[in-house]
Swiss-Prot record:
Pfam families: BPTA (PF17044). It is found in: Cell outer membrane. The gene is bptA. Keywords: Cell outer membrane, Membrane, Signal, Virulence. Belongs to the BptA family. InterPro entries: BptA. This is Protein BptA. Virulence-associated protein essential for survival of the bacterium within the tick host and therefore within the natural life cycle of the spirochete. Residues 1-19 form the signal peptide.
Length: 206
C-alpha cells in the first residue's frame, strides 16, 4: 500500500512538473468566450502573453468572430448596403491589446512592427460605422490624443492603460509569418516600450 501511494505521488509530481514547464515554455494563457444574443453569436479567442519586469504587463491577441445566421446566407454575402457592408468588415476582427501600468493616463502616438516599418496606420476611434472600417489600412491605433486633457495628471495609484490595435486581415497574414514578434510602442511622452518574443500566432488555428 505504501509503495502504491509513493508511486502515485511520484506520478502526480512528474505530471505537475511537466505541466508547469509547458506553461512556462509557451507563456501563453488561452481563453475562449462565446456570447449569444438572439440568434447571433460572438466568439472571442484570447491569447495573453505576460511580462514580469516592465511597465508593459500584457500583450493580448484577440480574434473576434461575429456570426449572424441571416447574413451568413449565400444571397446576403453578395449583398450591399450598410448592414451587409458592416458585417463583411466586422465578421472577423483581429486585435492586439497592450496593457501598460503607470501612475499617469497615457496616449500612444506610434506602433512599429519590425519588418513592416512602412505599414500604413489608421488613427480613428475603434467603435465606428462600417464605412470607416472599410478604410482600415494595415492597422489602426485609435486617436492618440483622445485623453489629452488628462495627460498632465499624476495619480497616487496604478493606472492600467490599454492600447487597442486593430489589424487588417491582410496584415495579420503577414505578421503570422514572422519568427518573432518585435513591436515598439511610443507614448505621448516619447517613452518606448519594446517587445521581442517568439511569434506564437502560427501555433494556433487562427
Amino acid at each position: 500500500m505504501g509503495k502504491i501511494l509513493f508511486f502515485g505521488l511520484l506520478l502526480i509530481c512528474i505530471f505537475l512538473g511537466f505541466f508547469f514547464y509547458k506553461q512556462k515554455e509557451n507563456n501563453i494563457i488561452y481563453n475562449r468566450i462565446v456570447e449569444k444574443f438572439e440568434d447571433n453569436v460572438v466568439i472571442d479567442e484570447i491569447y495573453t502573453h505576460l511580462f514580469k519586469d516592465s511597465n508593459l504587463k500584457e500583450l493580448v491577441f484577440i480574434k473576434s468572430q461575429l456570426i449572424i445566421p441571416e447574413l451568413e446566407h449565400k444571397k446576403m454575402i453578395k449583398a450591399t448596403g450598410y448592414r451587409a457592408d458592416a458585417y463583411k468588415a466586422l465578421s472577423t476582427v483581429y486585435r492586439f491589446d497592450f496593457k501598460v501600468h503607470d501612475n499617469k493616463i497615457l496616449g500612444f502616438k506610434s506602433v512599429i512592427f519590425e519588418g513592416f516599418e512602412d505599414a500604413k496606420v489608421s488613427k480613428h476611434e475603434n467603435n465606428l460605422p462600417s464605412e470607416k472600417w472599410q478604410q482600415l489600412k494595415d492597422f489602426n491605433i485609435g486617436d492618440p490624443n483622445i485623453n489629452e486633457k488628462f495627460f498632465h495628471l499624476e495619480f497616487p495609484f496604478v493606472v492600467k492603460n490599454t492600447l487597442c490595435v486593430t489589424i487588417s486581415k491582410g496584415f495579420f497574414k503577414k505578421i503570422k509569418k514572422l519568427k518573432r514578434l518585435k513591436i515598439m510602442l511610443i507614448s505621448n511622452e516619447d517613452r518606448e516600450y519594446k517587445i521581442d518574443i517568439e511569434n506564437f500566432l502560427p501555433k494556433y488555428n487562427l
